[in-house]
Amino acid sequence: MKNILKVFNTTILALIIIIATFSNSANAADSGTLNYEVYKYNTNDTSIANDYFNKPAKYIKKNGKLYVQITVNHSHWITGMSIEGHKENIISKNTAKDERTSEFEVSKLNGKVDGKIDVYIDEKVNGKPFKYDHHYNITYKFNGPTDVAGANAPGKDDKNSASGSDKGSDGATTGQSESNSSNKDKVENPQTNAGTPAYIYAIPVASLALLIAITLFVRKKSKGNVE
């Protein structure tokens, strides 16, 4: 009887370790950090606005969708942002550092995605009065993993509402006027949803079945010993 109980306890402990290990592996695969750059719209040229975006960003997959969490400095200058038509969801603010972290739904974590930015400045910059109010397109270049897929589709935020694009000059920092952009945001097709591997869900089921079988076996043995 003692030997049976030892086997039973060892098996239970092993199952707990296995389930915890695979659960942690699944969670680790669905979140992490990614480096990125902010480009002038539809180019490979780094935007001066890139300096106002802290690196790296964080990504997370939840409910089959991909999200990135981006932190900006000079937060009070940047009055609005969107990526692939999805408006920002502000999740935290740091008034002392003038920073905020916003979450965006995205279609992928690696490659270019289009975004929009609203900038309003009415204060002294480098000791001189400066006023600037503009809305323009930018391009994010994500350098994240390619094996984390989501079922995201681009949002339907008014794609033609931007009054200009950050292509050739950086209005947010130079104050130069920019020509109106008639180009629609070009959004690449989202990746198909690979989903979480099936074995992640099968492991707890198999473990439960094994636990039930062992329990019945132990009870049967115990009953036999009593009789």
Curated annotation (Swiss-Prot):
Stored Gene3D superfamilies: 2.60.40.1850
Signal peptide, first to last residue: 1-28
Keyword entries, A-Z: Cell wall, Heme, Iron, Metal-binding, Peptidoglycan-anchor, Secreted, Signal
Transmembrane segments: none
Protein name: Iron-regulated surface determinant protein C
Domain notes: The NEAT domain binds Fe(3+) heme iron. Reduction of the high-spin Fe(3+) heme iron to high-spin Fe(2+) results in loss of the heme from the binding site of the protein due to the absence of a proximal histidine.
Family in the record: Belongs to the IsdC family.
GO CC entries: extracellular region; peptidoglycan-based cell wall
Low complexity: bias regions: 161-172
Induction notes from the record: Repressed by fur in the presence of iron.
Family annotation (Pfam families): NEAT (PF05031)
